[in-house]
Amino acid sequence: MNIVNTIKDVRLIIKKWKDENLSIGYVPTMGYLHEGHTSLIKKAREENDKVIVSIFVNPIQFGPKEDYSTYPRDLVKDSSLCEKFGVDLIFNPETSEMYPNKIYSHINVDILTENLCGEKRPGHFQGVCTVLTKFFNILNPTKAYLGEKDAQQLAVVKKMVEDLNFPIEIIGCPIIREEDGLAKSSRNAYLNKQERKSALILNKSLKEALKALESGEKNLNNIKDIIVSKLNKEPLAKIDYVSIVDSITLQSVEKIQSSILVAIAVYIGKTRLIDNFTFKL
């Protein structure tokens, strides 16, 4: 397995692979890898000749009061995990490699970024789309693998790839959970013992909502109320948003047409966690 830090070097490797007509699966990450990431790597390994993982904590997708400086990093552990799961190449550029000068060009995806995390984290998806556009141009992958836990990000990136004619297939992979139901996240590392226990309220509230939908509840305001009521019973939980949107357009819906995304963002102490599920008629 190679670990490469420069765009020049990674392009030389990619060119060789492309000359040999090899397919490339790409997993973009910010590092501090967990089982959610390794599920993406395994899928990429199954479907491609070569697998690349990028590890880059992207500064332009963090707001001024967010956790860029404290975001967990552990390249040694990440490298070991990547090697274990058959990754061929880790691309781990410095910030100065990705952004050597002040950046004037940004990628925005309208409409899909107007609510959910896009509303609560202004500029976040512009940063995500800009860095992924750079990575797609540098790495030229056949397929890219993203987790469904970040459902809005997945929808936004799919639309960006469609609109800008990137010759890349975007593959969404299911949420991976701890045994007790908490969605795997690098930010779970911030939680102390009590907060970790309290964080289970996210999945519990969504489970109640899903159960109501499966039992025939069609009033989406009632579904929201079920989630809010459950979350409010947890003292350490502070709701950022509870939203029900069309799973493709991410626009708010008043009734279920075909497929809905039920998404929540909740602060447990100072840590912001997200979770979701999709429900189809």
From Swiss-Prot:
CDD domains to which the protein is assigned, alphabetical: PanC
Catalytic activity entry: (R)-pantoate + beta-alanine + ATP = (R)-pantothenate + AMP + diphosphate + H(+)
Listed GO MF terms: ATP binding; pantoate-beta-alanine ligase activity
Species of provenance: Clostridium botulinum (strain ATCC 19397 / Type A)
Pfam families: Pantoate_ligase (PF02569)
EC annotation from Swiss-Prot or TrEMBL: 6.3.2.1
Residues annotated as the enzyme's active site: 37
The protein, known as: Pantothenate synthetase
Binding site for (R)-pantoate: 61, 153
Subcellular location, record wording: Cytoplasm
BP terms from Gene Ontology: pantothenate biosynthetic process
Sequence positions that bind ATP: 30-37, 147-150, 176, 184-187
Function: Catalyzes the condensation of pantoate with beta-alanine in an ATP-dependent reaction via a pantoyl-adenylate intermediate.
CC terms in the record's Gene Ontology section: cytosol
Binding positions (beta-alanine): 61
Gene3D superfamilies recorded: HUPs, Pantoate-beta-alanine ligase, C-terminal domain
Similarity remark: Belongs to the pantothenate synthetase family.
Gene, per the UniProt record: panC
